[in-house]
Amino acid sequence: MTRAEVEPGAQAKAENKPGDENANAAEVEPEAPLVVRPKVRTQIMTGARPKVKPKGTPGARPKGETSTPGGAYAKCKPKAIPIARSKHDAQVWAPNKFRGESMSKMGKQCQISAADPPLLSNDSGMVAQAKCLPVDRELANMDTESIPKKANSPAGFQPSYGSEEGTNMGSWYRARPVPKGEAYENSDFKWADKPSGSPSFWNRDEASTRFRPRKSMKANNRFRHMAKQEANTMPRHKNKQEFYNISSSDSEDESGKTPWFWPKDKTKVWSKPKEEPNSRSWFRSKKEVRVESTSGSECENPTKSLFWSGEEAKSRSKPRARKGVNMRARQQAKREACSDAMSGAIDTNKKESWFLPEEKANVFSKSKTKKEPRTRAVPKEEVKTKARASTKQEARPEEEVLVGAWFWDTQESTMADRISIKTTFVEEEPIVGDWFWSEEEASVDSETCHTSRPRAKEEQVSSFCLGSGKKSSMESGPKATSKSMPVAKEDEVVIGSWFWADDEEINLQADDESIFGSWFWGTGENSLRSVGVNCEKMPKAGEKEVTDSWFWAGDVNTEAEVEEQARSASTKATIFVPWFWSEKQPNMDLGSEPCSDIMAGAEEEPIIGPWFWAKVDNSVEAEVNSKSSLEDEEEPIRSPWFGAREQTDMKYAAGIRYKPMAEAEDANKKSCVWAKEPCLYPTNRECLKSTLGEKEDTVDPWLWSNNYPRTKTITGSWLWAAEEGNIDDETGEKIKLPTLEDNAFNSWFWKENEESIVEAPKREEFRPEAEEEDIIGSWFWAGDEDRFEPAAKINEENKIASEDEDTVGSWFWGNEEASLEAVRRGTFESAPGIKEEKVTGSWFWTDKAKVGAGSQTVETGSETEEEAIFESLIWAAKKDSIQAGVKRVSKPKDDGNIAVGSWLWSSDKATKEAKTLIVSEASPENGKESVVKFGSRAKDEVINKTGSGDNCKHSTEAETIVGAWFWEGDEASFESNPVPVCKAVCEPESSAEHEPDPSRRPQSWDEVTVQFKAGPWGKAGFPPMNPFRFPKEAASLFAEMFGGKPKLVEVGPEREPEPQFPFQYDPSYRSVREIREHLKARESAQPENWSCNCIQCELRIGSEEFEELLLLMDRNRDPFIHEISKIAMGMRGASQFTRDFIRNSGVVSLIEALLNYPSSRVRTRFLENMVRMAPPYPDLNMIETYVCQICEDTFDYDLDSPDQLSGLTMITHLTATSDYHKVVVNYLAGFFYLLNSGNTKTRFHVLKLLLNLSENLVMTKRLLVTDSVSEFMDLINREESDENIQIVLAIFETISKHIQKEALFSDDDDDDEEEDAVNLEPFISAFREAEKIAKELKRKPGNQKAP
């Protein structure tokens, strides 16, 4: 990390103008004429353009804008850039925690290695450079550069992490040609490689950060994917400074670039820890310091990009801080200065803070001049960020620009500067990583690292991490990787770092895989948190590199250290680990980070998993270690998790926008999305705890990885929620608890084919090779009560502007060929297959309210001209449904266009309605514009529903898994331990209903009884005729309505069950007009003179009730109710039992009872299944037990009570066949008691039950043995209703028929003893008497059939 390391890049870096704040480059010991400012850390980024003309940096753009489109704007020879940069990057990186050698190897892949190196570089060469620049320098720089502020701050800013501060993480991607104004900025990141053209992020020069030139800073803050944006991001002052992301425009090394940042502590975090790569990043944040992302004006920051959750709004203003990582680092000391400096610019920055969104043109407006070219280079990604400011990028068509943004919060007014990077790659696609972290009081620092993938073959990976600090809110910005580390106050340490390493060549070769890891951690007040991440990457089949990083926050002053270890292995594997945790006090926010893009041979399959876990209490320790070594065929595994601290307070806004431009073949684009804050989150101290196994908490959305022979880029995003104390990054306002606001996030992205880019500026090659597969994954969640506001804000500044594509919201992902399988874990796996296939899936979840969500995705084939469209709609609101729709169109090829619109979220009941609308549309190439539309409205209740999940498999061997899920949050706050509402599983839409779970069956009749309450509509004109209690026999009614009378299932000769009461329309049913006339005629006639057997008369439906029935049918679409209505109208046939039930209940009362108790169908379905499904099964023990329970409960009810009548009706229905006769006959004594003691209605039901038993010869013998004949004669001799007497006569007639077959009695071997006891004499005499009575009844006029 010494200058030497930096040297190659340093020279370039030296380019930084001496005048730059970062001019401290001088401090850096620039080599040669190049004045390298440590701040600039140009060395690493040869491509970066220092303010000073970098001589060494061919790719760097000196302050003066170099015309070189190659990506070198600097006067320096562009030539050096590619090589130098990559090399340097690699070298620099090498010193860094990330393995240097690896990096150096990667160096070949300048971009990639460069990309990795940037992160490392912070520690290493860059760091060295930065080291050169002490905090003092930083201050000096800032001060010095206050004039140039805008321009220089970015540049100097990078290196600005003085060595004391820790080398600044401020290095970044390659330098990109920048107008001289920009040069120093670039120099910050200069990379030797133009291709590396990825800009790193950092806050502007610290000086600039510090300096008032917030505006320029602004540009910086808001880094955009696009170079132009990036350029814009640079302080405006430096119009030229645009080097932003786009620093190198080399077409070749695009992928190599990676942006990252890190903040330097006041003390050089880096240097102080180990200089070696391992020590690569440390952060110490001050408690007080607050880091903010500079994403635009504090308020305006509509951009998602910054967040900070400073406790104070001012923190927000400070966000500009990111201008200088140094700022950050030195800022500690100068926090306030930074604040000031930033504040001015901040506003502007805010907007640009991320994404290419144009945000406000204001950002970088000055830079525009030069930027424009940059922008151009970006191919019209139209970095659209305001930042893009029209920087013109002379990037090759294939160049891609990346922008990264992120945030951090610092507490208090201090601002920790955040770094944002903008990167543009000429040819390579850069990767952007975002993350956030918050510090407790202290600012949190986070660093992101990207790797960009090398050319067509290279793959980019981004990872995000975030941490939250105890008090500080955490915000995350999406995208650029940046690590800004506020100098920590002694009391607090914040650390965030992560990375992954990219192989030297990330070309996706069948055998190569890269691994990235990212993570964060936050420190609780004093608690130390440590997280370990292990990344492993295999450059070649034969090599395997592993990087490990982790950090922890030490108590107060502890520093976080990131360590990367590289290891080579014969096999390659990729591992990604994301996770986070939050400090105890601070809100724990979880973020998920998907970071992995593996390009492996067709056979390889990567797996990515994000997760979190939260710990209760203050301390959370999370360590993620994901290591995978695979044979060529093995698949990488990654596991993320995190712990949350109690009472985490975090706010998350994540936005990533990633637009890389690659060569035509390498048009792999990724689009990122961010979520706006105010995101939700658990405001509770509840910790989220999520383990891989159980995803108790939340949120893991994510990604996937692609396996392709070709390059791919991956972006990851995640979210978290902020607690009520948080400040909204964008607005700078304090975030209200979720109860107040709706949170919505989106996260987003997916990975597209190497060629395909989702939302990529260049859609150049959307189609992957035959075996390539695109996967897009996105998902969301709904914020709890909070309404999601950030989107709107984002919109406002970010605007992500028309050109940029911002995606907010949730969505989907599509797999090209592969199937997506949603894993409960939220993993999505897809393996590319030989053929292309795209699948899109989307889902949501919703807060506690019910959720209704529908998602629809359409994807069209991906060919060069293919266009993929994804749509997902989600909305959930309990009372007020929210609708969210995401629509995405992506076309490969230069002409491809992508449109993404999404919105969704739900808010809890308590949430106020929040409405945000973001529209982002981006078309690759010249005409790109991005519009993001984010509309959300949350009403009292939110309902989220997972609409769908797609599953596809691409390659035989390789698989990618992406999982998404959601959970519900509590009313007032986001639930720290949300429970997944659903698991997205691909299963046939027509999945059969599951049989009832025996363990859930009622143990007593009480569990099945349903008592209905009067419904609100009862007062609306349909009052029940009489109190109605839903009878238990309704189960059989429903069973009958949907499958015929359960019991009456007969097996025909062909062994096919034939329901005895099949439902069919009666061809002779009357029309409504005819029924009305008939009912009126009946009412006008005398009851004794009216005789009609039509269904209306049988059901005793009156004219008034019939009209109510028609209204109910018209107002309701419930099939149950329509079936009942059709029976009542004679349109459907029904069994006698069903007709009796409807008549006794009253058709309107029955329907209203059903309407009043929506869950009745669930309960009755259980009975229906028991009654209907049991007979076909040989084991009837369960049903027999149930029948016994009904009989016993019936006798226990009050005599003649409705419950008792309901039980008798059910038993009568169950005895319609002989299946349960042996069970019921054991209770004959009880039934005869009811026959003697009950009223007419009770006797009627008992007689019908006995009539059913008499049909069975064996039961007939039991009836005769129990002396039932005398009981029947008593009924005949006393005054009894004609209906009951007719039933008694029917019983006698049935018994008589059996007696006539006396042989049957003697043939029964089972009842020998009873045979002797049967005495037929009493029955014969009784029968003769009954015969006389029957004849008398027949003579009576108006005799009607028993009911």
Swiss-Prot record:
In which residue ranges is the amino acid composition biased (Polar residues)? Answer: 461-484
UniProt keyword annotations, A-Z: Cytoplasm, Phosphoprotein
Which Gene Ontology cellular component terms are annotated? cytosol
Cytoplasm in keyword set: yes
- Identify the stretch(es) annotated as Disordered: 1-75, 145-174, 188-281, 310-344, 364-396, 460-485
Quote the biased-composition stretches of kind Basic and acidic residues, using this chain's numbering. Answer: 263-278, 370-396
Give its localization: Cytoplasm
Q: Which residues carry this modification: Phosphothreonine?
A: 860
Q: Which GO terms describe its biological process?
A: endosome to lysosome transport; G protein-coupled receptor catabolic process
Q: Where is the composition biased (Low complexity)?
A: 21-33
Q: Which domain of life is it from?
A: Eukaryota
Q: Which Pfam families match?
A: Arm_2
Coiled-coil spans in chain? none
Which residues get modified to Phosphoserine?
295, 619, 626, 862
List compositional bias (Basic residues) regions by residue number: 211-226, 316-325
List the expressing tissues.
Expressed in the brain, with higher expression in the hippocampus, hypothalamus and olfactory bulb.
**What is the recorded function of this protein according to its Swiss-Prot or TrEMBL entry?**
Modulates lysosomal sorting and functional down-regulation of a variety of G-protein coupled receptors. Targets receptors for degradation in lysosomes via its interaction with BECN2.
Q: How does it assemble?
A: Interacts with cytoplasmic tails of a variety of G-protein coupled receptors such as delta opioid receptor/OPRD1, beta-2 adrenergic receptor/ADRB2 and D4 dopamine receptor/DRD4 as well as D2 dopamine receptor/DRD2. Interacts with PER1. Interacts with BECN2; the interaction is direct.
Name the family the entry cites: Belongs to the GPRASP family.
**What protein am I looking at?**
G-protein coupled receptor-associated sorting protein 1
Species source reads Mus musculus (Mouse)
Its lineage reads: Eukaryota, Metazoa, Chordata, Craniata, Vertebrata
Give the gene symbol. Gprasp1
